[in-house]
UniProtKB/Swiss-Prot annotation:
Propeptide: 1-2
Xref: InterPro entries: RuBisCO, RuBisCo_large_chain_AS, RuBisCO_lsu_C, RuBisCO_lsu_C_sf, RuBisCO_lsu_fd_N, RuBisCO_lsu_N_sf, RuBisCO_lsuI
GO cellular component, one term: chloroplast
Modification N6-carboxylysine, positions: 201
GO molecular function annotations of the record: magnesium ion binding; monooxygenase activity; ribulose-bisphosphate carboxylase activity
Annotated site (Transition state stabilizer): 334
Protein name: Ribulose bisphosphate carboxylase large chain
Cofactor notes: Binds 1 Mg(2+) ion per subunit.
Other comment: The basic functional RuBisCO is composed of a large chain homodimer in a 'head-to-tail' conformation. In form I RuBisCO this homodimer is arranged in a barrel-like tetramer with the small subunits forming a tetrameric 'cap' on each end of the 'barrel'.
Gene (name only): rbcL
């Protein structure tokens, strides 16, 4: 080729590598109401300036790549690129920053949590220029959230279906989590529901194993539900875990649950995946089933303070993908959950409009418009002595779930359920009378145990049980 010959590459295109901040760090940018906003905790490698690190996150999670490419000229990068528009240091940390990134809405497929996460928490988390990266929060604009169905039914519809108002709902995970036959499993379900619980639950590990195939479990649990309903006059439910190896099998199990006439099914939304979860949520709305969500695997993603994704983001994603309940920690039990942080994402699950509040870890104001809310489920290492704190912390719109705290009662499953129901009713009554559960909770339980031998026995068994470990994820 003659030296004088001009090519496309030599006109308006300069090959090579340039700093991300030249294109993707735009502190002058005014965010739009339609932008998806993200707050990342960024720990750069030594020698990488904060602006370059923040810009790299914006680039690698949107339109950028490691080198300049001539096909940039075939589109409008200004329209589609992510922008790092602000950076602030993390107090008390030497080389850590919060980078705020704005993404134009056109980058994301409507109604797809899967596509949204593929971009925002995709390959950028393995980027070598960063020692660690954590997505702390996400602002989902109404223009995007309205493309999602959200929860199949929501809090008010669930209460109307169950005809239960003015108190938290009570549940129990059947134990041992693995190894029971379907008939013995159904027996435990019946005893707990007859004793006063609203729900019992499949453990997240229970799918369709050799010792208990899913169809047998579904049938025996349905029998237990109907028998308990007939004896108590209350509507009962059992979270039948429909999680399976394929979406087709999952839907088949949900169809069978609907044919049995039970009110609720369950899904492990992180191990099952967002695409499967959204499909199941759509089926549940169309067919009148409530959907309980377990968060198995969440701690792999959210427990480390410097890397991964905070659970408040996973909670928002679940509200969009669809679920009527989700496990949300207990604050007082055996599982991770600091109070202010937990209440922050509990509000993000339940409320329509949540103001920015950094004291609770909420980086952005979130407007869900008319999307139904999700009931937070407190579960894991809780018992009757925790009831006042749980009632005070979570309020009425919650599910309090006692597995070992029901089935571990010295007199059996039904007395364990009675003890929990009595404790809950006593706490709700005391609260409604104006008593301070935070200060008087133990006294409320002691008073109730004087006329409930089941509660008295439970109080004696668990009087010394505490889980006093420092939370890993704090503000």
């Amino acid at each position: 080729m003659s030296p004088k010959t001009e090519t496309k590459a030599s006109v308006g295109f300069k090959a090579g590598v340039k700093d991300y901040r030249l294109t993707y760090y735009t502190p002058e940018y005014q965010t739009k109401d339609t932008d998806i906003l993200a707050a990342f905790r960024v720990t750069p490698q030594p020698g990488v300036p904060p602006e370059e690190a923040g810009a790299a996150v914006a680039a690698e999670s949107s339109t950028g790549t490691w080198t300049t490419v001539w096909t940039d000229g075939l589109t409008s990068l200004d329209r589609y690129k992510g922008r790092c528009y602000d950076i602030e240091p993390v107090p008390g940390e030497e080389n850590q920053f919060i980078a705020y990134v704005a993404y134009p809405l056109d980058l994301f497929e409507e109604g797809s949590v899967t596509n949204m996460f593929t971009s925002i928490v995709g390959n950028v988390f393995g980027f070598k220029a960063l020692r660690a990266l954590r997505l702390e929060d996400l602002r989902v604009p109404p223009a995007y959230s309205k493309t999602f169905q959200g929860p199949p039914h929501g809090i008010q519809v669930e209460r109307d279906k169950l005809n239960k108002y003015g108190r938290p709902l009570l549940g129990c995970t059947i134990k041992p989590k693995l190894g029971l036959s379907a008939k013995n499993y159904g027996r435990a379900v019946y005893e707990c529901l007859r004793g006063g619980l609203d729900f019992t639950k499949d453990d997240e590990n229970v799918n369709s194993q050799p010792f208990m195939r899913w169809r047998d479990r579904f049938c025996f649990c349905a029998e237990a539900i109907y028998k308990a309903q007939a004896e108590t006059g209350e509507i009962k439910g059992h979270y039948l875990n429909a999680t399976a190896g394929t979406c087709e099998e999952m839907i088949k199990r949900a169809v069978f649950a609907r044919e049995l006439g039970v009110p609720i099914v369950m899904h492990d939304y992180l191990t099952g995946g967002f695409t499967a979860n959204t499909s199941l949520a759509h089926y549940c709305r169309d067919n009148g089933l409530l959907l309980h969500i377990h968060r198995a695997m969440h701690a792999v993603i959210d427990r480390q303070r410097n890397h991964g994704m905070h659970f408040r983001v996973l909670a928002k994603a679940l509200r969009m993908s669809g679920g009527d309940h989700i496990h949300a920690g207990t604050v007082v039990g055996k599982l991770e959950g600091e109070r202010d942080v937990t209440l922050g994402f509990v509000d993000l699950l339940r409320d329509d409009f949540i103001e920015r509040d950094r004291s609770r870890g909420i980086y952005f104001t979130q407007d869900w418009v008319s999307m139904p809310g999700v009931l937070p489920v407190a579960s894991g290492g809780i018992h009757v002595w925790h009831m006042p704190a749980l009632t005070e912390i979570f309020g009425d719109d919650s599910v309090l779930q006692f597995g070992g705290g029901t089935l571990g009662h010295p007199w059996g499953n039904a007395p364990g359920a009675v003890a929990n129901r009595v404790a809950l009713e006593a706490c709700v009554q005391a609260r409604n009378e104006g008593r301070d559960l935070a200060r008087e909770g133990n006294e409320v339980i002691r008073e109730a145990s004087k006329w409930s031998p089941e509660l008295a026995a439970a109080c004696e068994v668990w009087k010394e049980i505490k889980f006093e470990f420092e939370a890993m994820d704090v503000l």
